């Protein structure tokens, strides 16, 4: 298999990993019936193929290739191994010890239990998530050069981001000021939005700990990261409502 085909295959695997990961977060375990599992397995490759094709086409339009992305990916994998070891011994060990103490002394509240269970879920699925995140981080390193050639498009993306943030802010304010029972048509969306944003914040925090996206934020690449996260929030909310 030549390098071009391998890069395309790896891109598909990365896209598939991200989509399946968000499906796992979006759908409650009790809703994972056999027919829905089959539906996820059938739908996810279709989205992964479309996403991989669009990414490949986008890079080719600007004179780049997937192979350049995978060169950057090799360095990210080396960084991940180092950051993962540091994460386990510096961050996870104290958290596990603190959790054991809280549990032993009987102060294991539902909120703490939910947080630790979500933390454990993210950590257990982190290899799957890392496969996708590493690819997108490498692509962003290439995209940083692409963005300089398309300032008009970048400005449009920033405007689009602020519009979405304004809409989300209005939704949050309206939820605080108006009880959901008074707006029954928005109850499902409110719940899905809260769950989706909360889980995405946990994912962002975990990746900042890993040091993968953390370094990118430090290099002022936050707008494009935000641009990628907003479509994920929207799709996440849609899946939550669909599978509720």
Curated annotation (Swiss-Prot):
Subcellular location: Cell membrane
Domain of life: Archaea
GO-annotated cellular components: plasma membrane
Record keyword Transmembrane present: yes
UniProt keyword annotations, A-Z: Cell membrane, Membrane, Transmembrane, Transmembrane helix
Entry keyword annotation includes Cell membrane: yes
Membrane topology: Multi-pass membrane protein
Chain segments annotated as transmembrane: 5-27, 37-59, 87-106, 116-138, 159-181, 196-218
Protein name: Uncharacterized protein AF_2132
